[in-house]
């Protein structure tokens, strides 16, 4: 059994109750520049943040100092699906916090964390791992991997979803997200996508926005 932890940060002068919060789900290599970037921005807007660490509590996700030895097995073993489960856990935990407004809990995720933020809205996954009666108020996946099709992945909750991707992202194909959004819109869902021109993966960070190797195909290794 894994124990996953997170850090709850309240903005300056936050109220004693009914504070909105955004759950932050990190990418493959853990909490880094992109996640810290959004933590600061969200807190500056008067919104609390809950930074989930999905790596350190998992046997195959414990990273060494140079991020090369074990971290790759985290993605290989879980393919980001653990972010979905962690997102549900964070939602349940925060909904019972005395200072948090349970109806204003949002989610933002980067890369593999964005997969969690995107697909935790799938009703089938919610039935498997979520808590009945609890949904996120909003979902913001940043450059998510949409290049895997799941059974009934067009049957989602009514949570508004806003996807952000770079036009030149070769790490995860942009077209797959555009097509997924079109499929969800055809179902009448509140989903939209923003494609930023001349930008790559992790485009919002100082060290990101660079060209990655192109992934030609993808095998998730497991069935969900």
Which residues does each predicted region cover?
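Serine-hydrolase catalytic machinery in alpha/beta-hydrolase-like enzymes
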Residues: 1-4, 17-96, 207-224
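Short beta-strand/loop motif that positions the catalytic acidic residue
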Residues: 157, 163-165
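Hydrophobic beta-strand anchors of alpha/beta hydrolase catalytic cores
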Residues: 22-24, 49, 139, 161, ...
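Conserved alpha/beta-hydrolase "acid-adjacent" motif
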Residues: 170-179
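A short loop-to-beta-strand scaffold at the N-terminal edge of the catalytic core in hydrolase folds
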Residues: 2-12
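Catalytic histidine neighborhood in serine/cysteine hydrolases
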Residues: 185-210, 218-223
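Glycine-rich His-Gly loop
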Residues: 24-30, 114, 144, 166-167
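Primarily recognizes the serine-hydrolase "nucleophile elbow" in alpha/beta-hydrolase
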Residues: 45, 78-157
């Amino acid at each position: 059994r894994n124990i996953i932890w997170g850090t709850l940060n309240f903005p300056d002068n936050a109220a004693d109750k009914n504070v909105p919060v955004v759950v932050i789900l990190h990418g493959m290599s853990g909490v880094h520049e992109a996640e810290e970037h959004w933590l600061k921005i969200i807190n500056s807007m008067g919104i609390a943040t809950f930074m989930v660490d999905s790596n350190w509590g998992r046997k195959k996700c414990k990273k060494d100092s140079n991020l090369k030895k074990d971290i790759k097995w985290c993605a290989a073993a879980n393919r980001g699906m653990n972010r979905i489960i962690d997102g549900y856990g964070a939602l349940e935990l925060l909904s019972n916090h005395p200072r948090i407004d349970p109806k204003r809990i949002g989610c933002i995720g980067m890369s593999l964390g964005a997969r969690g933020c995107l697909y935790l809205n799938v009703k089938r996954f919610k039935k498997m791992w979520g808590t009945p009666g609890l949904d996120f108020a909003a979902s913001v996946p940043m450059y998510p991997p949409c290049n895997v099709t799941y059974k009934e992945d067009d049957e989602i909750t009514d949570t508004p979803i806003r996807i952000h991707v770079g036009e030149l992202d070769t790490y995860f194909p942009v077209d797959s997200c555009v097509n997924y959004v079109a499929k969800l819109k055809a179902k009448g869902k509140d989903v939209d996508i923003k494609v930023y021109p001349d930008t790559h993966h992790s485009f919002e960070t100082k060290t990101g926005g660079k060209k990655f190797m192109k992934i030609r195909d993808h095998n998730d290794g497991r069935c969900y």
